[in-house]
A protein has these predicted regions:
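A substrate-engagement module of RecA-like helicase motors
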Residues: 188, 241-350, 358, 429, ...
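Conserved pre-motif I regulatory segment
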Residues: 176-218
């Protein structure tokens, strides 16, 4: 007998999905949504503590309900349950910035959420009647206003079952799709002949998902890692080991690789709804991304129409491409970005940036806001990027100068807000006087308390301005508003993985920073909501470093997948006469490096790229190169290139030419990873320097943090991030088994064991040479083609 499908859903998602209506208006929801701040926040807890011993706070509630052809498993958390003499009251707490006199009745969605909790609790406890209490608290005055309504169980059941009934047509549509999808997954074969080691890699991925573990994969170019990870994950979904996969990337170009892999599988007969989430600014129909009904016609009435747009796409099994989503948004007159987010709930695979899952200020609330776990599979591509991205996402700063700027903007407009800004500024001034360069601080809690008051005043001011018809506010005000809110959200996360410090920057700006040195714990908060995680990259070395900073588990799996490209197709040389140490820099060294470049490109006509540690270093070498080389076509990366300029740069490598072309690029930039220049489009890469980051306070804090814990602080702060840039840059050449190419490493430090032990296994054959020897080494390599 076939087991009934179980659909898991949070109470919040059910209510918001079925009962959504009205306009998109980020002047309200984008600025005044306090749920994230209140959850676990000071005021929330204060109200709960005041309710006495008969009050149970944060009560987890679950209900599995038989429906037409499936079981609905609902999960949620009631803010509180109050047991009075003969009454049971479900309490839902919401913070507001407007005067409580203007709160005349509960917000329908808030009330519906509380009624769901009341029904679940009454059903489980056998209660004939139960009360629902909506507690609204003004965030400025901390005054409280309550609305209480009593319901019989029969009333609640009728209302609740009607809500579920509205959801049933969606669930049945999804179940039918999944039956078809799973049948075709079972029939879909691996789309290529397995390369050597590729089957074993795919088997490792499937095994990891089966046992609900994490896997770290170091897979060099040529292992076919994308398909070896994606195919077994899709198979696992067909076997019921997951119901949605998130393919997470750091860069747009990597998302294209994932899309191509899905397309290849679909050509082999797979039916799998995959969607790529495009940034709001890129997919927006309007010139300015202003999400409110006054500025955007698609925002007006969006929630009244969007469910019809979603259902139509699902029912007609339209592909969820950017183009089809934009057409559907036009047809139904809805926001294309919000439509794509709604469609992601019904997709089998979501391709998106890291921040949609991990960023506490930008994650997809529909999946990750309520701490409700799901059968998610996380496939994290180019996972070496997640360390720095994680640090950025979980860190926050406030600048004194930004506080002053907003204070001066508003000095004649709102006394209470200006007073709060002055209070914050005064405390920052005291901290600035104690700081020469940077200073570690034991606790910034007194500062955070002042920021809480400031945020409340800013929200009150926004509310009053909007009611007076002045919705638009200066950019400086809104930027500070979001910075303050982010700072307070990050402050809630503080633990032993953080360092708090003040810094007086070289330009005179003073900041207070919450710096997340080790993001593993925060990342794990989201990863534990899924079943399994696969971290993979061509440069995940040393793997223990990444395990330390990306995971908190001690029993994670790890695999090294070696490239099977012929060793004879790769020539690795270390230039013994080059150095990028600061003490060695100068015209003479730039001249030597320029000569290495000239000899390399003279060895064979074709396309080359040289990667440098900085734009300034690149320009210094370029100046010397241009003095000594003619007949070499140059293409140069510039700072702040637009997407069109990047495309034009890469198109230069498509042309056939009878002379050498040399690209001048920066390590760690847009062209040092993710680009795929196969065959003769690129035949040589020169990496200038070890990639070691410049010394700065953040780096020194990382170094000292790990030194104090008995780990190799210099390696964690400088060596490993630097060598990752080197490996990524070098990986731009030799992309297929037929490619041949040169990798020239220009820094005498590459001769040291400290650096060579971080070389991938494929680099075991290398030669050290000066400028005199390099020419014959090149000639010999190209002659033996």
């Amino acid at each position: 007998m076939e087991t009934e499908k179980i659909i898991r859903l949070s109470v919040r998602n059910l209510v918001e999905f079925i009962l959504k209506e009205g306009d998109i208006d980020n002047r309200i929801s984008g600025t005044l949504d306090k749920d994230a701040m209140l959850m676990g926040g000071r005021l929330h807890r204060k109200i709960q503590r005041m309710m006495g011993s008969n009050y149970q706070a944060e009560v987890s509630l679950k209900l599995q309900l038989p429906c037409d052809g499936f079981q609905l498993k609902l999960e949620g958390r009631a803010d509180g349950i109050l047991l009075e003499s003969e009454k049971t009251i479900i309490d839902e707490i919401k913070g507001v910035v407007r005067s409580l006199d203007r709160v005349e009745h509960p917000v329908p969605v808030h009330l519906a959420q509380a009624k769901c909790y009341a029904y679940i609790y009454a059903r489980q406890q056998g209660l004939k009647q139960i009360s629902v209490q909506m507690t609204y608290c003004n965030l400025d005055t901390e005054d409280v206003k309550r609305f209480r309504e009593e319901y019989t169980f029969e009333e609640l059941e009728k209302w609740f079952l009607d809500l579920v009934h509205q959801y049933e047509r969606w669930a049945k549509l999804q179940i039918e799709w999944e039956k078809r999808r799973d049948a075709l997954i079972h029939q879909t074969k691996f789309p290529f002949a397995y390369r050597e080691g590729q089957f074993e890699l795919a088997a490792s991925v499937y095994r990891t998902i089966y046992y609900k573990k994490k896997l770290f994969i170091q897979a060099s170019t040529g292992t076919g890692k994308t398909m070896a990870v994606l195919y077994p994950a899709v198979k696992a979904i067909g076997e019921g080991l997951g119901d949605k996969l998130f393919y997470l990337t750091a860069k747009t170009i990597t998302r294209t690789v994932a899309e191509q892999a899905f397309s290849i599988l679909e050509e082999k007969g797979l039916a799998f709804r995959s969607i790529t989430l495009t940034a709001k600014e890129k997919i927006c129909f309007c010139e300015e991304t202003e999400c409110n009904p006054d500025a955007c016609p698609y925002a007006k009435g969006h929630f009244d129409r969007v469910n019809d747009a979603v259902y139509d796409m699902l029912e007609k099994q339209k592909k969820l491409t950017r183009e089809s989503i934009e057409r559907q948004a036009e047809d139904f007159h809805v926001c294309p970005f919000e439509l794509s987010l709604d469609l992601s709930e019904w997709a089998d695979g979501v391709i998106c940036d890291y921040n949609y899952v991990f960023d506490p200020t930008a994650h997809l609330k529909r999946f990750f806001a309520d701490n409700v776990s799901g059968d998610y599979l996380f496939l994290i591509d180019e996972a070496h990027n997640l360390v720095e991205r994680g640090r950025d996402m979980y860190s926050a700063s406030i600048y004194k100068e930004d506080i002053l700027e907003v204070k001066n903007l508003l000095k004649d407009r709102d006394k209470k807000l200006v007073k709060s800004l002055e209070s914050v500024n005064k405390l920052m001034l005291e901290m600035k006087r104690e700081c020469e360069n940077y200073r570690l601080v034991e606790s910034v809690s007194p500062f955070a308390i002042k920021l809480m008051n400031l945020l409340t005043q800013m929200e009150r001011y926004l509310e009053e301005e909007r009611n007076a018809g002045h919705a638009e506010q200066p950019d400086a005000f809104m930027e500070l508003f979001f910075q303050v809110r982010q700072f307070l959200e990050i402050h809630e996360l503080l633990d032993e993985n953080y360092i708090q410090y003040t810094e007086l920057e070289g330009n005179g700006r003073f900041k207070i920073k919450l710096f997340c040195v080790n993001p593993a714990e925060n990342l794990n908060h989201y990863l534990k909501l899924g079943n399994s995680t696969i971290f993979f990259s061509a440069t995940l070395l040393p793997i223990d470093y990444y395990k330390q900073l990306l995971s908190v588990e001690k029993d994670d799996y790890a695999v090294y997948a070696e490239s099977k490209f012929p060793q004879k197709n790769r020539k690795i040389l270390i230039g013994s006469e080059a150095s990028t140490k600061y003490t060695q820099r100068g015209t003479e060294m730039y001249r030597k490096i320029a000569e290495y470049l000239r000899i390399t490109v003279d060895g064979k006509n074709g396309n080359y790229i040289a990667f440098f540690p900085s734009y300034q270093f690149m320009e210094d070498v370029l100046e010397e190169f241009e003095k000594r080389s003619s007949g070499v076509e140059l293409v140069i990366q510039s700072q702040f290139m637009s997407e069109n300029q990047r495309e034009e740069f890469l198109e230069m490598f498509e042309e056939e030419r009878d002379h050498p072309m040399l690209g001048f690029c920066v390590m760690g930039g847009v062209f040092s990873e993710g680009i795929d220049l196969t065959h003769d489009r690129l035949i040589g890469v020169i990496v200038v320097g070890t990639g070691i980051p410049q010394v700065c306070n953040d780096r020194e804090i990382v170094k000292n943090y790990f030194d104090q814990r008995g780990m190799r602080g210099f390696d964690y702060a400088y060596l490993y991030p630097g060598m990752n840039k080197v490996l990524q840059s070098a990986g731009r050449v030799i992309r297929t088994e037929d490619d041949r190419g040169i990798i020239l490493l220009l820094d005498d430090r590459f001769q040291n064991r400290q650096y060579q032990q971080l070389f991938p296994r494929e680099w075991k054959e290398y030669e050290v040479c000066g400028r005199k020897e390099i020419k014959e080494k090149m000639e010999e390599f190209w002659k033996n083609r």
